[in-house]
């Protein structure tokens, strides 16, 4: 394997942390957790290919960004420890850079190829039976039918149908982060999945802060990347745009139309790179909704700049 394939874990201050050390640290940091409570949370940071290209896919820059993002993670807790806000030193985490991704069964390309894959598998099985003399059939015709199905399938890489397990092309570096449920002192339980938004509640006669501000974490992490690497983020790459696309597609498209000429050109190029032609203007009204839904689906699948998931 190349050195890039031999990435170890790192945290805020240390590097080259071995997997067994990570397991030991996480397993040993679970004081007073109930049996059904998770020992840790998983976060994935997935810079887009545009962002990776901008930083030349540099692992050092990715590590630097993760460390900055984890500062934002800590400050997004609406909690206090010893009367002070939570800081990154209170968070026990371990991160690892991965450089490859494979297609999964729930990826758009795999799902939309599935009907073709099924027919091809059936025909290949039939072809083998004909070749073994188990059934009568025209092998040349079956082979032609297989080639046609491959040709007609919507998603391919170098002529091959995209299927689960196939490696994705292009820059695919992403970071997996394991964050202990308990703080670094093994005293306080910290959950980014808290159902409570940032608020205060009275407990045992005292007002206690609680909650985790997800929007703040996403937006500030995005700003940190842009600030650190002088990245000029396009509207369609922004967290606020992705959120608007999910909640109010009509407003999202209005915002796209109102972009400056240069930014709009780049935005539409990014959208086209997700694999869908933009809907033409002046579509009959009954087709507009369909086009918007299809475009929305493809943008969500294809544009995940600095996406951070749990």
Regions found by a protein language model. Give the residues of each.
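N-terminal nicking endonuclease/strand-transfer module with a His-rich metal-binding environment
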Residues: 1-310
């Amino acid at each position: 394997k190349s050195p890039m394939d031999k990435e170890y874990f790192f945290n805020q201050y240390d590097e080259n942390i071995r997997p067994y050390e990570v397991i030991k640290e996480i397993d040993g940091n679970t004081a007073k957790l109930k049996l059904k409570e998770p020992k840790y949370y998983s976060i994935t940071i997935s810079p887009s290919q545009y962002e990776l290209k901008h930083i030349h896919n540099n692992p050092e820059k990715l590590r630097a960004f993760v460390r900055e993002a984890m500062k934002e993670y800590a400050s997004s807790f609406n909690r206090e420890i010893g009367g002070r806000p939570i800081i990154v030193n209170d968070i026990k985490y371990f991160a690892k850079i991965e450089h490859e991704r494979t297609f999964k069964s729930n990826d758009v390309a795999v799902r939309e190829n599935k009907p073709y894959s099924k027919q091809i598998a059936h025909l290949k099985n039939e072809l083998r039976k004909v070749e073994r003399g188990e059934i009568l059939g025209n092998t040349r015709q079956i082979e032609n039918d297989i080639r046609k199905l491959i040709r007609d399938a919507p998603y391919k890489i170098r002529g091959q149908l995209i299927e689960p397990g196939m490696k994705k092309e292009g820059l695919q570096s992403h970071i997996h982060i394991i964050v202990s449920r308990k703080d670094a002192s093994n005293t306080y339980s910290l959950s980014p999945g808290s159902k409570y938004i940032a608020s205060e509640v009275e407990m045992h006669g005292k007002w206690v802060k609680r909650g985790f501000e997800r929007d703040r974490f996403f937006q500030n992490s995005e700003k940190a990347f842009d600030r650190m690497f002088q990245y000029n983020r396009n509207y369609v790459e922004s967290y606020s745009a992705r959120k608007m696309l999910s909640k109010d597609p009509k407003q999202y498209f209005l915002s796209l139309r109102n972009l400056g000429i240069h930014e709009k050109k780049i935005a539409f190029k990014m959208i086209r790179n997700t694999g869908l032609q933009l809907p033409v203007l002046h579509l009959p009204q009954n087709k507009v909704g369909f086009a918007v839904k299809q475009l929305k689906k493809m943008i969500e699948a294809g544009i995940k700049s600095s996406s951070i998931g749990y």
